[in-house]
C-alpha cells in the first residue's frame, strides 16, 4: 500500500487481491456480523506480557505466522507520558485476533466434543472468519451423516457419525485440530493422504473490508454490551482503523490492523452558537470518529516525544527533517475509514445524472449542504444571519471531499504532523450509489480545469479506495433513546463518552453537562501540550483557537473554498468568532 500521505496512485504494485480486486464499491456485499467478543479466560493463557501491553487489550487483526510490534498504544490522559497498560483488566480482556501468530493457543488440547462447536464458533467470531458447517455425502452406511467445517473457503476434514449433531461436533474438532496444527507447526508439510488445505493467510481468511468491520464491531462490543441502554447506537457506528505493515523475509509482509477511533451519531447540535469552544457541533458518527482520531494522534505525539525508546518504536508518528511539520506518519502505516450509513449530502443525492460532457455536475445535489436548525439545505440557501448565530455544519459528504484534499489532521495538528490521508473507505450501507459516492468525494471541486497550482504544497487530492463492507449494526431499528446521543472513544480512553447532541456536551442529569473531550477547547489544550513536548515554544504564543490554525492549512482551505464557489457549488462557511476563545 502506498504511503497514506502520498495518495493512492503509488500503491498498485503492493496491493494484493485483498484490496486491489475492488477499487470501487461492489454492489452486493456479503452479509456478515461478528459475534461479541468473549472473555479472555475462555481462551486459556493470556498473550505474553510485552505483546499484550503494547496492544492495550484491544482488538487487532494480524496475519502470517509470527508476532511483531503493534501500532503503539496511546498514552493516558493528554499530557501524561505513560502507556495505558491495564485497560484490559479494567474492561474485561477479550481474545486477541491474530491469524495465527506464534504463541496463540486454543483453549483446550483435547476439548470435549460437546464444547467443540461453541469453541470453534467463538474462535471464528473473534477473527471475523466466515464459518460454515455443511453437510456432505456420507461415506457409507456405517456413518449416515457427514459434516465439514469451512473457514472462509478453507474446507477442513469432515466429521462422520450416526447423528447430524455428533457429525457437526466431529467436524468442529477436526477444524480445531487443523488450526492448532497451524499454530504449533505452521511450516510442517502435509502428510495426510487428503489434498493439502489452503494455508491460513490474509488472502483466504479475511478480506480488507471484513477485517475493518470485525475490528469496529469487536471494539464496540468491548466498550458496551447488549444490556447497555446505548447498545442501539451501534446502528450509526463509524471507525478509524490503522494498518501497519511489517516487512518479512522473502518479500512477505505482515499486516496488523488496529482500531484507533470510534464514533456514533446521526445529527448535529441545532442550538445557538457558543463562543467558549466547549460545544460539540457535528455529532455524526463519521465526524466524531475523525475527531477521536485527532485525540489519538495528539497522544501519539506525546508517546513519540516523551515515551522513551519504546514510545518512539510504538508510536505511529516519526520525526522528519526539513522546514515542514516535525512529524509524519511512519512508512507502511495507513488509515482506513469504516462507516455504517451513506454520508448525508451529495453522496445520497442520486436522482440526477452527471453532465453528458463528463465534467463536474453543477446540479443542486452536488452543491455543498449544511445542517442548520435540524434541516439539511444547500449553503446558498442559508441566511447569513443564521450562519452567524446558530450552529451550522456541512454534510459528511462535503467533509469527506475536504479530507481527500486537506487530510484528516485538521488545522491545529498541521503545525506538527504532515497531512494524513485515508487510504480506503468501507461503507456498510447497501442502499447507495457507488458512482455518486465517488463523485461526491473525488470531483468537488474539479481540479482538472484549473490552470497552474491550485493548492499550496504539500496538499494534494488523494483517491480513496471504496469498498462495500459487511454491516455490524443491530438488525433492530435504532430506538428514540439513542437518536439524540453520540458516543466517542479513541485508543487510550478508559471508556465511552456519551454526548447529548442537543447541547453538544457530555450527557448529564443536570441541564448542562461538562464539555466533551472532543470539543475545540480540549483540542487547543492538547495542541499546547504537544507543542511543548515537541519543542516548539513559539506555538505556545498562539493563545486562541483561531490563531493556532496553521497558515498553510488555512491557505489550502481558502483555495478549496474559492474553487468550490467559482464552480457553483457554494463557499465553505467560515466562523472566525467561534475560534476566538482562549484556554
From Swiss-Prot:
InterPro entries reported for this sequence: A_deamin, ADAD2_DSRM, dsRBD_dom
| Principal location | nucleus
Taxonomy, superkingdom: Eukaryota
> Any idea where this protein resides?
Nucleus; Cytoplasm
- Lipid biosynthesis: is it a keyword of this entry? no
Keyword vocabulary terms for this entry: Cytoplasm, Differentiation, Nucleus, RNA-binding, Spermatogenesis
Extract the Gene3D superfamilies matched here: 3.30.160.20
Extract the Pfam families matched here. A_deamin, dsrm
Residue span, A to I editase domain: 261-582
* Disordered: annotated segments: 1-48
> Which molecular-function annotation in GO is an example for this chain?
double-stranded RNA adenosine deaminase activity
GO cellular component terms, A-Z:
cytoplasm; nucleolus; nucleus
- Entry-linked PROSITE patterns: A_DEAMIN_EDITASE (PS50141), DS_RBD (PS50137)
Segments spanning the bilayer are none
The residue ranges of the DRBM domain are: 115-181
Which processes are annotated in GO (biological process)?
adenosine to inosine editing; RNA processing; spermatid development
Described purpose of this protein according to its UniProt entry: Required for male fertility and normal male germ cell differentiation.
The family annotation for this protein states: Belongs to the ADAD family.
Task: Write down what this protein is called.
Answer: Adenosine deaminase domain-containing protein 2
Q: Which gene encodes it?
A: ADAD2
